[in-house]
Regions:
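N-terminal leader/propeptide and maturation segments of large enzyme subunits in energy/redox metabolism
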Residues: 51-117, 211-238
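Gly/Pro-rich active-site capping loops and adjacent beta-alpha segments
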Residues: 1-61, 126-238
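Helix N-cap/coil-helix junction residues
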Residues: 80, 122, 187-188
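Accessory "access/gating" subregions that flank catalytic or transport cores
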Residues: 87-154
Protein backbone atom coordinates (compact mmCIF):
# COMPACT_ATOMS: atom_id res chain seq x y z
CA UNK A 1 0.00 0.00 0.00
CA UNK A 2 1.29 3.46 -0.80
CA UNK A 3 0.42 7.13 -0.81
CA UNK A 4 1.27 9.81 -3.33
CA UNK A 5 0.46 13.39 -2.42
CA UNK A 6 0.98 16.82 -3.92
CA UNK A 7 0.60 19.66 -1.44
CA UNK A 8 0.20 23.24 -2.68
CA UNK A 9 0.08 26.15 -0.24
CA UNK A 10 -0.59 29.87 -0.59
CA UNK A 11 1.92 31.68 1.62
CA UNK A 12 0.71 35.14 0.64
CA UNK A 13 2.86 38.17 -0.07
CA UNK A 14 5.61 37.17 2.37
CA UNK A 15 7.18 33.83 3.24
CA UNK A 16 6.63 34.27 6.99
CA UNK A 17 6.40 30.67 8.27
CA UNK A 18 5.07 29.29 5.00
CA UNK A 19 8.09 26.99 4.65
CA UNK A 20 7.81 25.27 8.05
CA UNK A 21 4.02 25.06 7.69
CA UNK A 22 4.45 23.30 4.34
CA UNK A 23 7.04 20.97 5.89
CA UNK A 24 4.59 19.88 8.57
CA UNK A 25 1.83 19.49 5.99
CA UNK A 26 4.02 17.15 3.94
CA UNK A 27 5.46 15.08 6.80
CA UNK A 28 1.94 14.47 8.11
CA UNK A 29 0.21 14.03 4.74
CA UNK A 30 0.00 10.25 5.16
CA UNK A 31 -1.78 10.56 8.49
CA UNK A 32 -1.32 8.06 11.34
CA UNK A 33 -1.19 5.09 8.98
CA UNK A 34 1.42 2.63 7.76
CA UNK A 35 2.48 2.77 4.11
CA UNK A 36 5.17 0.72 2.42
CA UNK A 37 5.68 3.35 -0.27
CA UNK A 38 5.13 7.08 -0.32
CA UNK A 39 5.89 10.07 -2.51
CA UNK A 40 4.96 13.48 -1.12
CA UNK A 41 5.81 16.76 -2.84
CA UNK A 42 5.00 20.21 -1.49
CA UNK A 43 5.25 23.69 -3.01
CA UNK A 44 4.50 27.06 -1.42
CA UNK A 45 3.68 29.99 -3.69
CA UNK A 46 3.90 33.73 -3.21
CA UNK A 47 0.61 35.43 -4.04
CA UNK A 48 -1.04 38.80 -3.49
CA UNK A 49 -3.05 37.38 -0.60
CA UNK A 50 -2.33 38.16 3.08
CA UNK A 51 0.69 36.31 4.55
CA UNK A 52 -0.07 32.85 5.91
CA UNK A 53 2.05 32.41 9.01
CA UNK A 54 1.72 30.48 12.24
CA UNK A 55 -1.56 28.97 13.39
CA UNK A 56 -2.61 26.01 15.50
CA UNK A 57 -2.18 22.71 13.70
CA UNK A 58 0.56 24.28 11.58
CA UNK A 59 -0.33 22.69 8.22
CA UNK A 60 -1.25 19.29 9.61
CA UNK A 61 -5.01 19.84 9.69
CA UNK A 62 -5.27 20.63 5.98
CA UNK A 63 -3.60 17.46 4.73
CA UNK A 64 -5.32 15.45 7.46
CA UNK A 65 -8.73 16.50 6.16
CA UNK A 66 -7.79 15.41 2.64
CA UNK A 67 -6.35 12.07 3.78
CA UNK A 68 -9.34 11.21 5.95
CA UNK A 69 -11.78 12.09 3.17
CA UNK A 70 -9.92 9.85 0.72
CA UNK A 71 -9.93 6.96 3.21
CA UNK A 72 -13.71 7.19 3.47
CA UNK A 73 -13.98 7.09 -0.32
CA UNK A 74 -11.65 4.07 -0.48
CA UNK A 75 -13.63 2.23 2.18
CA UNK A 76 -16.82 2.79 0.22
CA UNK A 77 -15.23 1.46 -2.98
CA UNK A 78 -13.98 -1.79 -1.40
CA UNK A 79 -17.11 -2.35 0.68
CA UNK A 80 -15.79 -1.99 4.23
CA UNK A 81 -16.56 0.52 6.96
CA UNK A 82 -14.48 3.67 7.54
CA UNK A 83 -13.57 2.18 10.92
CA UNK A 84 -12.26 -1.03 9.35
CA UNK A 85 -10.02 0.65 6.79
CA UNK A 86 -8.44 2.75 9.52
CA UNK A 87 -7.96 -0.20 11.84
CA UNK A 88 -6.28 -2.33 9.17
CA UNK A 89 -3.83 0.40 8.24
CA UNK A 90 -3.28 2.10 11.61
CA UNK A 91 0.34 2.80 12.49
CA UNK A 92 1.63 0.38 15.11
CA UNK A 93 4.68 0.44 17.39
CA UNK A 94 7.87 -0.35 15.48
CA UNK A 95 6.58 0.84 12.11
CA UNK A 96 7.97 3.84 10.24
CA UNK A 97 6.19 7.07 9.32
CA UNK A 98 6.92 8.96 6.06
CA UNK A 99 9.18 11.39 7.93
CA UNK A 100 11.43 8.50 8.97
CA UNK A 101 10.24 8.34 12.57
CA UNK A 102 9.91 4.85 14.05
CA UNK A 103 6.91 4.98 16.36
CA UNK A 104 7.32 3.64 19.89
CA UNK A 105 5.05 1.86 22.35
CA UNK A 106 3.26 5.09 23.29
CA UNK A 107 1.44 4.96 19.93
CA UNK A 108 -2.15 4.07 20.75
CA UNK A 109 -4.20 4.48 17.57
CA UNK A 110 -5.19 0.80 17.47
CA UNK A 111 -6.33 0.86 21.10
CA UNK A 112 -8.25 4.09 20.49
CA UNK A 113 -10.12 2.59 17.56
CA UNK A 114 -10.89 -0.55 19.54
CA UNK A 115 -12.29 1.57 22.37
CA UNK A 116 -14.97 3.13 20.14
CA UNK A 117 -15.78 0.01 18.09
CA UNK A 118 -18.93 -1.09 19.96
CA UNK A 119 -20.54 2.33 19.97
CA UNK A 120 -19.58 2.88 16.34
CA UNK A 121 -21.15 -0.41 15.23
CA UNK A 122 -24.25 0.19 17.36
CA UNK A 123 -24.79 3.59 15.76
CA UNK A 124 -24.50 2.07 12.28
CA UNK A 125 -27.01 -0.69 13.13
CA UNK A 126 -29.49 1.91 14.38
CA UNK A 127 -29.13 3.86 11.17
CA UNK A 128 -27.66 6.88 12.88
CA UNK A 129 -25.30 9.15 10.97
CA UNK A 130 -21.84 8.51 12.36
CA UNK A 131 -18.43 9.68 11.28
CA UNK A 132 -14.91 8.74 12.25
CA UNK A 133 -11.56 10.41 11.71
CA UNK A 134 -8.01 10.02 12.98
CA UNK A 135 -5.25 12.59 13.23
CA UNK A 136 -1.86 13.04 14.78
CA UNK A 137 0.61 15.84 15.40
CA UNK A 138 4.09 14.59 16.21
CA UNK A 139 6.57 17.45 16.07
CA UNK A 140 9.32 18.22 18.52
CA UNK A 141 10.48 21.57 19.87
CA UNK A 142 12.45 23.41 17.21
CA UNK A 143 14.25 22.16 14.12
CA UNK A 144 17.85 22.39 15.34
CA UNK A 145 18.43 26.02 14.38
CA UNK A 146 19.43 28.74 16.88
CA UNK A 147 16.48 30.55 18.44
CA UNK A 148 16.30 33.81 20.32
CA UNK A 149 14.18 36.10 22.44
CA UNK A 150 14.90 39.72 23.33
CA UNK A 151 13.66 42.04 26.03
CA UNK A 152 14.49 45.55 27.30
CA UNK A 153 13.78 46.74 30.82
CA UNK A 154 14.00 50.53 30.97
CA UNK A 155 13.44 52.88 33.90
CA UNK A 156 11.60 55.87 32.46
CA UNK A 157 10.59 59.30 33.74
CA UNK A 158 7.73 57.93 35.81
CA UNK A 159 10.30 55.93 37.85
CA UNK A 160 8.71 52.70 36.69
CA UNK A 161 10.30 49.81 34.83
CA UNK A 162 8.90 49.50 31.31
CA UNK A 163 9.05 46.14 29.53
CA UNK A 164 9.78 46.25 25.80
CA UNK A 165 9.81 43.21 23.53
CA UNK A 166 8.99 42.63 19.88
CA UNK A 167 7.08 39.49 20.81
CA UNK A 168 3.46 39.91 19.78
CA UNK A 169 0.80 39.03 22.32
CA UNK A 170 -2.12 37.45 20.46
CA UNK A 171 -4.16 36.22 23.37
CA UNK A 172 -1.79 33.94 25.27
CA UNK A 173 -1.10 36.52 28.01
CA UNK A 174 2.55 37.24 27.29
CA UNK A 175 2.32 40.65 28.95
CA UNK A 176 1.18 39.01 32.17
CA UNK A 177 3.95 36.42 31.89
CA UNK A 178 6.74 38.98 31.44
CA UNK A 179 5.36 41.22 34.19
CA UNK A 180 5.24 38.29 36.59
CA UNK A 181 8.79 37.31 35.67
CA UNK A 182 10.01 40.79 36.56
CA UNK A 183 8.17 40.63 39.90
CA UNK A 184 9.56 37.16 40.61
CA UNK A 185 13.17 37.95 39.70
CA UNK A 186 13.48 41.45 41.19
CA UNK A 187 12.36 43.27 44.33
CA UNK A 188 9.80 45.27 42.35
CA UNK A 189 6.04 45.17 42.76
CA UNK A 190 3.38 45.00 40.06
CA UNK A 191 2.61 48.70 40.40
CA UNK A 192 6.26 49.49 39.59
CA UNK A 193 6.07 47.79 36.19
CA UNK A 194 4.55 48.80 32.85
CA UNK A 195 4.22 46.32 29.99
CA UNK A 196 4.51 48.08 26.64
CA UNK A 197 2.77 46.50 23.69
CA UNK A 198 5.17 45.36 20.98
CA UNK A 199 6.14 47.68 18.15
CA UNK A 200 8.69 47.56 15.35
CA UNK A 201 10.15 50.99 16.10
CA UNK A 202 11.64 50.51 19.55
CA UNK A 203 11.09 46.99 20.85
CA UNK A 204 13.77 44.39 19.97
CA UNK A 205 12.91 41.55 17.60
CA UNK A 206 11.91 38.38 19.43
CA UNK A 207 10.92 36.17 16.53
CA UNK A 208 7.49 34.75 15.89
CA UNK A 209 4.69 34.19 18.36
CA UNK A 210 4.19 30.54 17.51
CA UNK A 211 4.57 27.08 18.94
CA UNK A 212 4.18 28.36 22.52
CA UNK A 213 7.78 29.59 22.29
CA UNK A 214 7.54 33.13 23.65
CA UNK A 215 7.16 32.20 27.32
CA UNK A 216 10.31 30.10 27.02
CA UNK A 217 12.63 32.23 24.88
CA UNK A 218 11.52 35.81 25.56
CA UNK A 219 10.75 34.82 29.14
CA UNK A 220 14.39 33.76 29.52
CA UNK A 221 15.54 37.04 27.95
CA UNK A 222 13.38 38.87 30.49
CA UNK A 223 14.88 36.87 33.35
CA UNK A 224 18.41 37.74 32.24
CA UNK A 225 17.44 41.41 31.97
CA UNK A 226 16.11 41.18 35.52
CA UNK A 227 19.52 39.95 36.68
CA UNK A 228 21.12 43.08 35.21
CA UNK A 229 18.49 45.29 36.84
CA UNK A 230 19.23 43.75 40.23
CA UNK A 231 22.98 44.16 39.71
CA UNK A 232 22.42 47.88 39.20
CA UNK A 233 20.04 48.17 42.17
CA UNK A 234 22.43 46.29 44.44
CA UNK A 235 25.17 48.66 43.31
CA UNK A 236 23.07 51.59 44.50
CA UNK A 237 21.78 52.73 41.13
CA UNK A 238 18.16 53.87 40.76
Amino acid sequence: MGVKATVVSDTGAYASLGGPVLERACTHAAGPYHYENFEIEGTAYYTNNPPAGAFRGFGVTQTCFATETLLNMMADKVGITPWEIRYRNAIRPGETLPNGQIVDNSTGLVETLEAVKKKYDAALEEGKPVGIGCAMKNAGLGVGLPDWGRCKLIVEGDSKVHIYSGASCIGQGLGTVLTQMVVTNTDLKHEDIVYERSNTWFAPDSGTTSGSRQTLVTGEACRRACDKVMEDRNAGKT
